[in-house]
Amino acid sequence: MSKTEIKTKQTNASVEDFINTFANTEQKRKDSFELLKIMQDFTGFEPKMWGPSIIGFGQYHYKSEKSLQEGDWPLIGFSPRKAAISLYVYSGCSGQEDLLKELGKFKMGKSCVYVNKLSDINQETLKKIMKSTIDFLQTIIARKKTEQIKMIKFVCYGKKEEYNQ
C-alpha cells in the first residue's frame, strides 16, 4: 500500500470572505462569526482556512498506520456546510460521551458534531469538549515527541539503556 497525501491543507484564503460567501443563510453567517470568536478566544490561535471549506485553529501532525496517510490537521475547527454547521471538536477521548449528553440538539458524524444553529447547543459544554480534545491531542503530541527523542538517543548512542530512560 502506498502513502497517500492528504488533500485538506492549510491555505492563505480569507476566513471572513469564506464565511460571507459560503454560509448560505444570514443565521449561518451570524453563527459562523460567533463560532470564529469563541474558538479564537478559547484557543488563542488565529483562524486559518483548511482546504476550501474548513476553518481551523492550531494544528497538529498525524500519521495513520491504517491508511498510511500523514499530514497536518487543525486541533479544532468548523465549517458552515449547506445542511448544518460541522464542528470538528470531537476526538472520542474519555469523558466526551458524557459531555455530548449535555450539549443540546445535534447530530453526530464519525468525528464531528453537526448543529443547525449555535443556539441549539450549550456553549459552555462546547468549550469543555474543545478543551478535552485539545488536551487529548496535545498529550499525544507530547508523548510522540518524547518517543522520538528516546529513539534518537537510541540511534545516536546505540545503547538500549539510553532508549529506556
Residue ranges and their predicted role:
Residues 1-158:
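Charge-dense, helix-prone N-terminal extensions
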Residues 163-164:
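Intrinsic-disorder-associated, low-complexity terminal segments enriched in Asp/Asn/His/Tyr and depleted
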